[in-house]
Amino acid sequence: MFPNSILGRPPFTPNHQQHNNFFTLSPTVYSHQQLIDAQFNFQNADLSRAVSLQQLTYGNVSPIQTSASPLFRGRKRLSDEKNLPLDGKRQRFHSPHQEPTVVNQIVPLSGERRYSMPPLFHTHYVPDIVRCVPPFREIAFLEPREITLPEAKDKLSQQILELFETCQQQISDLKKKELCRTQLQREIQLLFPQSRLFLVGSSLNGFGTRSSDGDLCLVVKEEPCFFQVNQKTEARHILTLVHKHFCTRLSGYIERPQLIRAKVPIVKFRDKVSCVEFDLNVNNIVGIRNTFLLRTYAYLENRVRPLVLVIKKWASHHQINDASRGTLSSYSLVLMVLHYLQTLPEPILPSLQKIYPESFSPAIQLHLVHQAPCNVPPYLSKNESNLGDLLLGFLKYYATEFDWNSQMISVREAKAIPRPDGIEWRNKYICVEEPFDGTNTARAVHEKQKFDMIKDQFLKSWHRLKNKRDLNSILPVRAAVLKR
């Protein structure tokens, strides 16, 4: 695919190849998802690590030494594994509260009137088979039918679920992006030998669609030598070199490389082989961390992913999902959905950063952040609202309930909090807190006309959907499917 590809060349000397033929190709050819396959003894349902964590790293290309433990070799589940009862595959948490169910579960209440379910176990104790998110390799390459989806008994919920199943990112889509990442990393390491390239954003966080772009983060130095890059000077210089490399050496494989000098500068390009559009940034480390935070939320409750996808499609259709044009970024929209689900009378989602601070600490080294989802048990809400009611409630919340003038959306706190007084928050129409660095992810909405357009669309769509109970009233489903 790329000039310097070494596909098929054995990466290790004979003394490093040991007894296992799993790694017979260059380690950079395998995805970080596939490398993590070796981490678990799946056959015995023993999720203890079979590879030293110091050597097995997300996005790392170092040789991996295996133990004598049996390895998961990328096979499909055996038939007897597929037929295990649900309780044997995963355990869920039930609320300890005995209060009667709240009738109107789609209208958020103030913080003190909401119920939240604490974890059944202390955060430092996670039983081997108790977790909400399968290991990294299990999710990324699972066939869609193996992911349990919510039931849909009413028309609106069925429409949402059908749109999700049609438009969600497929395994083949992810593999294309991962292959490009692997081989681009090899090329970029000619310029920066210590660098690593991470696939981030919707491609990995569980909220991707078939048409989702690929987001890449170039980390120019590995930990513990990691350093902060000035995005206005050093990042632009690094990306200028990368852009030049793409134009001169990879013009046959990459088309339309373009250096965008934004607050966080990027190189935009299109991979001719996969036809995927990519955005590449430098050392935007928070993007790596929030990818795995969102990934955990995505698989924490089976209504989250379908709801997020249909809302992203709705926002895109109404032209309020484009930060480059002064509206909401997809990341902000996802945080808005998560916030809504956290603020219901019976929350559907908790604050993961509050319950599991050690799993989502900004101090975690980058090569370990992918393990966070494996430490989080399932979360079962008492809220039984269907997808249709949740979509309607989401629109109503931001059309009539949320105070845009004085409140900030905080997934970290699982509630709306007062706006800070800092300069970044002044004269901003929408405030959405980034869960790790505390910046405003909705800062692109800086014109009143665009803000009014966003609010107006929430209100109009809420009224239409409430009256029709048909997804086509706010989003032409056929057109959304064609775009995918």
From Swiss-Prot:
GO molecular function annotations of the record: ATP binding; metal ion binding; poly(A) RNA polymerase activity
Bias-annotated ranges (Basic and acidic residues): 77-90
Span of domain PAP-associated: 386-440
EC number: 2.7.7.19
Entry cofactors: Mg(2+); Mn(2+)
Modified residues (Phosphoserine): S62, S69, S95
GO terms, biological process: hematopoietic progenitor cell differentiation; histone mRNA catabolic process; mRNA 3'-end processing; negative regulation of miRNA catabolic process; RNA 3'-end processing; target-directed miRNA degradation
Family the UniProt entry places it in: Belongs to the DNA polymerase type-B-like family. GLD2 subfamily.
Keyword Metal-binding: yes
Catalytic reaction list: RNA(n) + ATP = RNA(n)-3'-adenine ribonucleotide + diphosphate
Name this polypeptide is given: Poly(A) RNA polymerase GLD2
UniProt-annotated stretches for the region Disordered: 72-97
One Gene Ontology term, aspect cellular component: nuclear RNA-directed RNA polymerase complex
Residues annotated as binding Mg(2+): D213, D215
Subcellular location, principal: cytoplasm
Motif stretch (Nuclear localization signal): 76-92
Compartment(s): Cytoplasm; Nucleus
Keyword Nucleus in annotation: yes
Tissue specificity as recorded in UniProt: Expressed in brain. Within brain, it is expressed in cerebellum, hippocampus and medulla.
Quaternary structure (record): Interacts with CPEB1, CPEB2, CPSF1 and PABPC1. Interacts with QKI isoform QKI7; promoting recruitment to miRNA miR-122 and miR-122 stabilization.
Pfam families documented for this protein: MTPAP-like_central (PF22600), PAP_assoc (PF03828)
Its biological purpose: Cytoplasmic poly(A) RNA polymerase that adds successive AMP monomers to the 3'-end of specific RNAs, forming a poly(A) tail. In contrast to the canonical nuclear poly(A) RNA polymerase, it only adds poly(A) to selected cytoplasmic mRNAs. Does not play a role in replication-dependent histone mRNA degradation. Adds a single nucleotide to the 3' end of specific miRNAs, monoadenylation stabilizes and prolongs the activity of some but not all miRNAs.
Swiss-Prot/TrEMBL keywords: ATP-binding, Cytoplasm, Magnesium, Manganese, Metal-binding, mRNA processing, Nucleotide-binding, Nucleus, Phosphoprotein, Transferase
